[in-house]
Curated annotation (Swiss-Prot):
Alphabetical list of CDD domains matching this protein: EcFpg-like_N
Gene3D superfamilies listed in its UniProt record: 1.10.8.50, MutM-like, N-terminal
Essential cofactor(s): Zn(2+)
UniProt cofactor note: Binds 1 zinc ion per subunit.
Family: Belongs to the FPG family.
One biological process term in Gene Ontology: base-excision repair
Binding site for DNA: H93, R112
Gene name as annotated: mutM
Protein name (Swiss-Prot/TrEMBL): Formamidopyrimidine-DNA glycosylase
Length: 276
């Protein structure tokens, strides 16, 4: 699933491609992707004649701002936005097409069909689901070691499970939580309430630096991720633990292990990340 670095790179490339374009028509071939309104035909009619003004990101969500509305899109596992010419062949996994007045088309492709789209009037999007209960962005002023400390010390849940909770902090998924905990030298099954102030500060620093580096490297292409210009990321070349079960730790040489935490495959070093 695309996490913050991947979604941010989709946002940047997509914004460069479609800002200023006017929607002439919308074709939805898999209506279940459209969650709001509950009728894809209404979704289509509301967007006709709308001009794309800018594209923002909230956590793992893309927000496409048009003249009067906001399209809130979650890519889930395999979702992709790609720009095409009107005479190009249509991929069988293309489920939504935004046809522009200049003859180009924005295609939403999704092999797994897990992605979602919600349409809101401008100004309503942040106060309604799926955005209403999201925590702060990792790079926001609100996100500080003190913010994390206040919340982590109130829960006995395992730290990996807590960091995956988008109500605490947005943007982290399975890949980057494993990397953050390795850099922090924290075992993924530690209870959050057991962490010291110094350990929480390490988590904070690792979160900000890991995500920042990943954004600069275009994200991580583990399987099929590409941005809206069709480019892969390169941060996968810098991953220390994710997907590396059985390989030696880059720090101590110990063989990396994999377990399941909160139903998610989890990679770690048993020496660098001791379970105290």
């Amino acid at each position: 699933m695309p996490e913050l670095p991947e979604v941010e790179n989709v946002r940047r490339t997509l914004e460069n491609l479609v800002t200023g374009k006017t929607i002439e028509d919308v074709i939805v071939t898999y209506p279940k992707i459209v969650k709001r309104p509950d009728d894809a035909e209404i979704f289509k009619e509301m967007l006709k004649g709308e001009k794309i003004e800018n594209i923002k990101r909230r956590g793992k969500f893309l927000l496409l701002y048009v003249t009067n509305y906001v399209i809130v899109s979650h890519l889930r596992m395999e979702g992709k936005f790609l720009l095409h010419q009107e005479d190009e062949p249509i991929d069988k996994h293309t489920h939504v097409r935004f046809l522009f007045t200049d003859g180009t088309e924005l295609h939403y492709k999704d092999v797994r069909k897990f992605g979602t789209m919600h349409l809101f009037k401008k100004g309503e999007e942040m106060n309604q689901m799926p955005l209403a209960d999201l925590g702060p962005e990792p790079f926001d002023a609100e996100m500080t070691p003190q913010y994390l400390q206040e919340r982590l010390q109130k829960t006995n849940r395992k730290i990996k499970v807590v960091l995956l909770d988008q109500r605490l902090l947005v943007g982290l998924g399975n890949i980057y939580v494993d990397e953050v905990l390795f850099r922090s030298q924290i075992h993924p099954e530690r209870e959050a309430s057991s962490l010291t102030v110094e350990e929480i500060e390490r988590i904070y620093e690792a979160t900000v630096t890991t995500l920042g580096e990943a954004v600069k490297r275009g994200g991580s292409t583990i399987r099929t991720y590409i941005n809206s210009q069709g480019q892969i990321g390169s941060f996968q070349e810098l991953l220390n633990v994710y997907g590396k079960k059985g390989e030696p730790c880059v720090t101590c040489g110990t063989i990396l292990e994999k377990t399941v935490v909160g139903g998610r495959g989890t990679h770690y070093c048993p020496i660098c990340q001791p379970r105290i």
